Design a protein with these regions (language model features):
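Terminal amphipathic helices with adjacent charged low-complexity linkers/tails
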Residues: 127-161
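Thiamine diphosphate
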Residues: 3-6, 147-338
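Glycine-rich ThDP/TPP pyrophosphate-binding loop and its adjacent helix/strand module
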Residues: 1-132, 309-340
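Conserved NTP-handling cores and scaffolds of large molecular machines
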Residues: 114, 140, 269-273
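Short, structured coil/loop segments at alpha-helix boundaries
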Residues: 103-107, 113-118, 138-139, 171, ...
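Intrinsically disordered or highly flexible coil/loop and linker segments, enriched in small
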Residues: 69-73, 134-145, 183, 187-188, ...
Length: 340
């Protein structure tokens, strides 16, 4: 919500609020209101219910039109009811209460009000479902495949030894790589915490905690952006940008904070290509310094890359003093399929 409001993103957040988790009622787990959360970020809150379909459709239309016209986010809360158990047979609610929800259900109401229309919709739905199931039955199964993940552990990589006689810092080499890629490809964008240099809010030079991005925010305006300290959120946004055809490079200030990014990588970025039958590409690069012996304390000095090894469709690369960082980044930018 914060990022959407801050960057004026025309997005509609649809919250289907059925008032319960698996068995825990919202009154036991939520303090305050959904509307209050939206207002805290300056986002308009709209509310409707599946109990009144006409009103729901009208509210949805208002939300869509306002988001497009004003180019701002909207939080649309749809109050609804869960008619069945959360997953299988684990519903411990009062049967009489559940029955009252069934009576309110719009589909059940339609069956009573207009049985002809109801039956027409059911018939069309059954035909569609039957058609899809038939396609699945006729398609090739995955059983004949040993794995649906490409074998890349033995991939040959063209590499060259880093010439230690070259008088250039590793960070400077990374900077040159980023600058060259941004020059040659307008789809390359940089996101991260404190990566901008001189801007309207702070005139002094900065360019990242380790000075990797330097003056890139001045050389490529609107393509280098400071973000809030919201690692999970900015990783999700970067993943979405990659799916949309951009080439985002996300900087996480310290490798220790990659624990906050893990869920977005494991459950989303690395899975999308397989989930969508190779029709989706996620050319996302996440860069982060890791390691100890710098006196930064127990939460800024860890090397946790091992926790990411073994995730399908994710390249994990560790820079070292024997390889030219520029070459590594050039190779990473050529990967247009999956995250690095």
């Amino acid at each position: 919500l914060n990022l959407a409001s801050l960057w004026k993103i025309p997005i509609i957040f649809v919250l289907e609020n059925n008032g319960i988790a698996q068995t825990t009622n919202n009154k036991q787990s939520i303090s305050g209101s959904v509307e209050g959360r939206a207002k805290a970020f300056g986002i308009r809150h709209l509310s409707s219910s599946t109990d009144n379909i006409t009103e729901l459709f009208n509210t949805c239309e208002i939300a869509i039109n306002e988001a497009r016209e004003n180019e701002e986010p909207i939080l649309l809360e749809i109050k609804t009811n869960r008619l069945k158990s959360h997953s299988k047979g684990d519903d411990n609610r009062d049967p009489n209460y559940v029955n009252s929800l069934n009576i309110l259900d719009p589909i059940n109401q339609l069956e009573k009000l207009d049985p002809v229309l109801f039956n027409t919709i059911v018939e069309k739905s059954d035909l569609l479902i039957s058609s899809v199931l038939k396609q699945v039955e006729l398609s090739e199964t995955l059983l004949k495949y040993k794995t649906i993940v490409d074998e890349r552990t033995n991939k040959n990589i063209n590499w060259k030894e880093y010439n230690s006689n070259i008088n250039i810092r590793g960070n400077d080499s990374i900077y040159e790589s980023l600058k060259n890629e941004m020059k040659s490809n307008e789809n390359v964008i940089l996101l991260g915490e404190d990566i901008e240099s001189s801007n309207d809010f702070n005139p002094g030079e900065y360019g990242g905690a380790f000075k990797v991005t330097k003056d890139l925010s001045m050389l490529f305006k609107d393509r280098v952006k400071n973000t809030p300290i919201s690692e999970q959120a900015i990783t999700g946004i970067s993943t979405g940008l990659a799916v949309a055809g951009m080439k985002p490079v996300l900087e996480i200030m310290f490798g220790d904070f990659m624990t906050l990014v893990f869920d977005q990588i494991l459950q989303h970025a690395s899975k999308f290509r397989m989930m969508f039958n190779n029709k989706v590409k996620v050319p996302l690069i996440i860069r982060s310094p890791m390691g100890g012996y710098r006196g930064y304390g127990p939460t800024h000095s860890q090397s946790i890359e091992k926790h990411f090894l073994g995730i399908p469709d994710l390249d994990v690369i560790a820079l070292n003093h024997r390889l030219d960082p520029k070459m590594i980044y050039e190779t990473a930018f050529k990967n247009n399929e999956y995250p690095t």
